[in-house]
Amino acid sequence: MTARLALLASLLLLLQLVPPSSAVVLELHGNVYPIGHFFVTMNIGDPAKPYFLDIDTGSTLTWLQCDYPCINCNKVPHGLYKPELKYAVKCTEQRCADLYADLRKPMKCGPKNQCHYGIQYVGGSSIGVLIVDSFSLPASNGTNPTSIAFGCGYNQGKNNHNVPTPVNGILGLGRGKVTLLSQLKSQGVITKHVLGHCISSKGKGFLFFGDAKVPTSGVTWSPMNREHKHYSPRQGTLQFNSNSKPISAAPMEVIFDSGATYTYFALQPYHATLSVVKSTLSKECKFLTEVKEKDRALTVCWKGKDKIRTIDEVKKCFRSLSLKFADGDKKATLEIPPEHYLIISQEGHVCLGILDGSKEHPSLAGTNLIGGITMLDQMVIYDSERSLLGWVNYQCDRIPRSASAITSRL
C-alpha cells in the first residue's frame, strides 16, 4: 500500500512538472473573392477596441493603421488606432533590434530615439513606429490582456486612400522574433511555437496558436526548410491530373503565405499550368471561351453560354493539380483540386486563381506562393517546434467549441 501511495505521489509530481499544451482560438471572417482577405477581430488597448487584422504567415510584424498622426491612411473599419506616445519603443530596446533582425535591415533610429520602420509589400508599403499595448485575448474567465509590441503604421504607400479597406492592418504570423506567436510563447500564454488556420470556402474559419488543436492523425507533414525566412517545405514538383511526369521543369521552392489571396507561380510553372488547363478545355469543354475580366487581378477567365454561378457547374472541365514535396524516400503531396484554384467572378465568369508572379511584382519573380485560395477547407499547421508544415482536409466552418477560451491539455 505504501509503495502504491509513493508511486501515485510521484505521478502527481510529474504531472505538475510537465507544462500543459495550450491554444488560443480565434474566429476567422472573409473570403477569397470578392473581399480578398481572411481576418480576425483583435481587441487592442485599454479600454480595448476591436480591429480587423488580416492573418499573414508571410509577414513577421503585426501592425495596424494609426493616427500618429496619419500621413497616408485608408478608410478602415473601426477607425484608426490612436497610440499613446509613451508606449513607443525606443531604439535602444531589444524589441527594436529584434524587429530589424526580422526585417534583415540595418537599424535606423527615428525622431525622439523611437523605433521607426519601413516595410515593403507586393501591393504597397507601410511606414510606422513600434508600439507596446495590450491585446485582450479570449480566455475562459473572459479576457486575458497581454502586452504586445506591434507596428503603428502612419504612412501607407501605393494604396488608393479614397477606397475603404476591409481590414485595419496585418496580424504578422511569420517566422521571427517580433511575431505575435513568439511574443505569446515568451510570455507563457502558449507553450508551443505552433499555429494553424482553417479557412472555409463558405466564408468562415478559425485561427489557433499553440498545439492543442492539432489533429493526432490524418495530417500530411513535410519538413520545413530551416534556412528559409518564410514557411517553406522542401522543394516540390508540380503535376497535372495525377500524371507521373511533372509539368514543372525543375523542383519548385514554395512558400505558404496566408496573406496572399491568390496562389502565385514562377514563370515556367505558371505557363505550364495555363497550357495544360487550356488544352483540356479546348478538347472537352469548348462551350467555355476566354474573356477579359473587368477585375484586373483576374488575368485569365472564361465565360459560358450563361452566367456561371458556382464552380460545381464547370468543375468537370478542369483537372486537379498536385505538389509533391520530397523528404528522402518519402513524399508529402498537397492536392490542389479545381475548387482550390478557380474563382467565380462577379461577372459570372470562371477565372484562374493562380497568377503569374513575375507580372505582379519584381520581388515575386522566381517565387511560388501558396495563397489562401489553395488553402481552402484545409487545416494548415505551422509547427516551428518540430520544423514541420502540415495540412489535412477539414470542415473549417465549424469553429471548435473552445473558440472563446484558452484551453489546455496534457
Swiss-Prot record:
Gene3D superfamilies: Acid Proteases (2.40.70.10). It comes from the Eukaryota. Residues 38-392 form the Peptidase A1 domain. PROSITE patterns: ASP_PROTEASE, PEPTIDASE_A1. InterPro entries: Aspartic_peptidase_A1, Aspartic_peptidase_AS, Nucellin, PEPTIDASE_A1, Peptidase_aspartic_dom_sf, TAXi_C, TAXi_N. The active site is at D56, D257. Residues 24-46 form a propeptide. Belongs to the peptidase A1 family. This is Aspartic proteinase Asp1. It comes from Oryza sativa subsp. indica (Rice). The gene is ASP1.
